[in-house]
């Protein structure tokens, strides 16, 4: 029998995945493609697409400290038989800006403190490459940018190659923008702002830089100081670099069946057809429309598989409850509670029609996100829209799957609930009675009364124009409709 493997649900440490015999969907074939690009790369993807795990893989591949462990770590993967000349050639510094948490007070101080910790860990990890005086200088310094300057100077003098990896480069800046407004955000990312100033220093300190995040907004505002970043998010060769293809999912499910970890009679094709409407259908590049191969949200697939292993069947709830946190974060980042009429209209239209025609803007500053023409692009980067087709010179952006559709309906439902609260338990009971016993009169009567009360609120969300949206938002509470 095939050896059993653990499901790496929620695991972002590549070395842990390999050493603990967890299942890994091989993405190492993208390493040569990335090396063919410019040295400073920026890649944007929605949450739960495996960004952190991918960056962890790159760190392990390029780290000179574990160069001699290459076959042990990568021997079973695509790159194991065809390593590039740059394998194991770098001292790698990894920063995860989601770790710069807390409230807005003393943000610069906390950012400096986090970078201090990372730079100290770096100099300790690569201690054999630096003399004692340099190590002591770095560890004694309180200002993180001075630590970096000391490291960079010594590395340059000794011809060391440094690789910078930044995960969630936009995490705390997006939080600042949402919670404190554009004025505080602008002070941090423009002119002599500390965040922008760091990016200027990064530019001259590293041979290679790879940054990942979920939003292009901070990218636009800080890269005028960085000004050498190469945006590869919508390039066709990287469309499937993160997430799973159908073949990836098929191979994974088949292996778990053959290893006896899911029932032997599991119908793999039926399982794939079951999850496609919920987790699949992402396309991030216009040039990939003709291929018809789309991308699954990988964390959702792992959630489904983990439940299938436990229960021998699909989970009762096809949407991972942990994504509720992601939805709340996205709501804050999109500032859904502060939407003006135009952007509310865009949300409503997408919810009712399933798509919208728009230009896709690669980057845009924070000052532009209030403009309705940029809003669909923001929804695209957050995974709330995907590329469905072309429409002349523009794109048809649509809801990718049921998981995202539920989020749109949830937003509408929250708006309606604020105007006229409906007891969702009572309504859910009525929906079940309608589905199993044909008692449709109670549901329609209940909804008609509720809609009339919503529509009477003139300054709400113009509910009189959205009968269809109202019904869809509430009927979608039940899996029967």
Language-model segments: which ranges?
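Structural recognition of the conserved hydrophobic beta-strand(s) that form the central parallel beta-sheet
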Residues: 163-167, 193, 207-214
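N-terminal pre-Walker A segment at the start of P-loop NTPase domains
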Residues: 2-32, 38
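The conserved Walker
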Residues: 46-47
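Amphipathic alpha-helical segments of the small helical/lid subdomains adjacent to P-loop NTPase cores
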Residues: 218-225, 232-306
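Conserved lysine of the Walker
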Residues: 51
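Extended alpha-helical interface modules used as scaffolds for assembling large macromolecular complexes
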Residues: 229, 294-481
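P-loop NTPase motor core
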Residues: 10, 26, 60-124
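Substrate-engagement module of ASCE P-loop NTPases
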Residues: 150-158, 184-209
């Amino acid at each position: 029998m095939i050896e059993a493997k653990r499901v790496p649900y929620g695991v972002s440490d590549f070395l842990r995945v390999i050493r603990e015999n967890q299942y890994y969907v091989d993405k190492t074939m993208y390493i040569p493609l990335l090396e063919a690009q410019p040295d400073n790369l920026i890649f944007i993807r929605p949450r739960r697409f495996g960004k952190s795990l991918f960056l962890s893989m790159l760190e392990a591949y390029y780290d000179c400290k574990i160069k001699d462990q290459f076959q042990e770590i990568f021997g079973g993967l695509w790159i194991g038989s065809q390593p590039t000349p740059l394998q194991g050639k770098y001292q790698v510094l990894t920063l995860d800006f989601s770790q710069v948490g807390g409230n807005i007070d003393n943000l610069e101080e906390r950012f400096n403190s986090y970078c201090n910790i990372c730079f100290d860990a770096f100099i300790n990890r690569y201690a054999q490459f630096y003399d004692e005086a340099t190590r002591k200088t770095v560890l004694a310094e309180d200002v993180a940018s001075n630590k970096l300057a000391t490291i960079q100077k010594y590395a340059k003098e000794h011809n060391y190659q440094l690789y910078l990896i930044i995960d969630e480069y936009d995490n705390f800046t997006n939080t600042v923008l949402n919670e404190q407004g554009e004025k505080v955000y602008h002070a941090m990312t423009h002119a002599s702002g500390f965040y922008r100033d760091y990016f200027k220093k990064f530019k001259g300190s590293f041979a290679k830089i790879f940054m990942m995040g979920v939003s292009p907004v901070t990218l636009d505002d800080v890269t005028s100081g960085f000004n050498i970043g190469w945006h590869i998010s919508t390039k066709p060769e990287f469309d499937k670099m993160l997430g799973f293809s159908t073949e990836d999912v098929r191979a994974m499910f088949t292996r778990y069946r053959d290893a006896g970890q899911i029932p032997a009679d599991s119908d793999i094709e039926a399982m794939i057809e079951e999850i496609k409407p919920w987790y699949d259908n992402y396309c991030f590049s216009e040039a990939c429309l003709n291929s018809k191969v789309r991308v699954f949200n990988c964390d959702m697939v792992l959630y489904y598989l983990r439940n299938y292993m436990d229960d021998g069947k699909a989970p009762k709830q096809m949407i991972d409850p942990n994504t509720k946190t992601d939805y709340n974060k996205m709501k804050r980042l999109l500032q859904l509670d502060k939407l003006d009429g135009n952007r509310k209209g865009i949300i409503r239209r997408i919810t009712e029609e399933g798509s919208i025609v728009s230009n896709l803007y690669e980057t845009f500053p924070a000052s532009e996100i209030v403009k309705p023409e940029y809003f669909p692009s923001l929804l695209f980067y957050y995974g709330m829209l995907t590329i469905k087709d072309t429409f002349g010179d523009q794109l048809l952006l649509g809801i990718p799957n049921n998981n995202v559709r539920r989020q749109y309906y949830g937003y509408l439902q929250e708006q309606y609930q604020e105007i006229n609260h409906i007891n969702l338990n009572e309504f859910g009971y009525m929906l079940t009675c309608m589905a199993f016993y044909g008692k449709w009169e109670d549901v329609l009567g209940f909804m008609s009364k509720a809609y009339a009360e919503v529509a009477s609120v003139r300054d709400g969300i113009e509910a009189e124009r959205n009968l269809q949206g109202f019904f869809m938002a509430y009927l979608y509470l039940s899996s029967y409709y």
